[in-house]
């Protein structure tokens, strides 16, 4: 099953999602758009198992990382990888 992992520009660079992912789908990359100077990126979405631990770990009010399973669709906001 194909999963889509999207990282939005509300990411605060805390690394919680990266540490929560059991499949190393996420990594931090440099980005000047937030105080932390980094943002989560999802370069290995093919390894995503859809557990949504990254979503659970995200401390922002608007989840900065979202996993869309199979047929779920959304209009992308911010940065999508």
Curated annotation (Swiss-Prot):
One of its GO terms (molecular function) is metal ion binding. The keyword 4Fe-4S applies. It catalyses: reduced [plastocyanin] + hnu + oxidized [2Fe-2S]-[ferredoxin] = oxidized [plastocyanin] + reduced [2Fe-2S]-[ferredoxin]. Its cofactor is [4Fe-4S] cluster. The keyword Chaperone does not apply. One of its GO terms (biological process) is photosynthetic electron transport in photosystem I. Keywords: 4Fe-4S, Chloroplast, Electron transport, Iron, Iron-sulfur, Membrane, Metal-binding, Oxidoreductase, Photosynthesis, Photosystem I, Plastid, Repeat, Thylakoid, Transport. Binds 2 [4Fe-4S] clusters. Cluster 2 is most probably the spectroscopically characterized electron acceptor FA and cluster 1 is most probably FB. Its EC number is 1.97.1.12. One of its GO terms (cellular component) is photosystem I. It is found in: Plastid, Chloroplast thylakoid membrane. Coiled coil: none annotated. [4Fe-4S] cluster 2 binds at residues 21, 48, 51, 54. Apoprotein for the two 4Fe-4S centers FA and FB of photosystem I (PSI); essential for photochemical activity. FB is the terminal electron acceptor of PSI, donating electrons to ferredoxin. The C-terminus interacts with PsaA/B/D and helps assemble the protein into the PSI complex. Required for binding of PsaD and PsaE to PSI. PSI is a plastocyanin/cytochrome c6-ferredoxin oxidoreductase, converting photonic excitation into a charge separation, which transfers an electron from the donor P700 chlorophyll pair to the spectroscopically characterized acceptors A0, A1, FX, FA and FB in turn. The eukaryotic PSI reaction center is composed of at least 11 subunits. This is Photosystem I iron-sulfur center. It comes from Rhodomonas salina.
């Amino acid at each position: 099953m194909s999963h889509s992992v999207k990282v939005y520009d509300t990411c605060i660079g805390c690394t919680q999602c990266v540490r929560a992912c059991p499949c190393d789908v996420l990594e931090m990359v440099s980005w000047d758009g937030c105080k932390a100077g980094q943002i989560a990126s999802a370069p290995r979405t093919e390894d995503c198992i859809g557990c949504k631990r990254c979503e659970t770990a995200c401390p922002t009010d608007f989840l900065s990382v979202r996993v869309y399973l199979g047929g779920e669709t959304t209009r992308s906001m911010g940065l999508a990888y």
